[in-house]
Amino acid sequence: MNEKERNDYFYVCALIEYIARETRNHRGDIVSAIGEAGIEKLLYDAEVNHCLSFEQVSDEVIEYYKIHQGDFDTISGCNYSIPSFLDIGKLYSIMIEDCAKKGEEVKELMKI
């Protein structure tokens, strides 16, 4: 994985975490709603979209993929400091790079 791909996966993973928090859904539900083709499109657009705010891009993704509000809350009951959506995105992008076979990164993102 080259540096651009690392940055793209970091961005998309952080975006998924951001959307999950905003809509109170599990990350897996967000990934399922977007689908493999949608993830590939987000990766393709990541270099441009990272110049926009997460709020704007997430609003567009939520509307386009018709992601509904859920009731999953991972934040309010925590006793410790909560990692930011960027921290979680970085963690997931590292896991994808470490675990995925070459050419199967999108499938790995969907599994994680």
Label the predicted regions.
Residues 32, 46, 73-76, 106-110:
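Short coil/turn segments at secondary-structure boundaries
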Residues 40, 60-71, 94-101:
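Amphipathic alpha-helical interaction surfaces
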Residues 11-18, 90-94:
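A general alpha-helix detector
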Residues 77-112:
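A charged, amphipathic interaction segment
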Residues 1:
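Active-site helix-to-loop segments that bind/position phosphate- or nucleotide-bearing substrates
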Residues 14-62:
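N-terminal interaction modules that seed assembly of large macromolecular complexes
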Residues 48-84, 88:
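Long, compositionally biased
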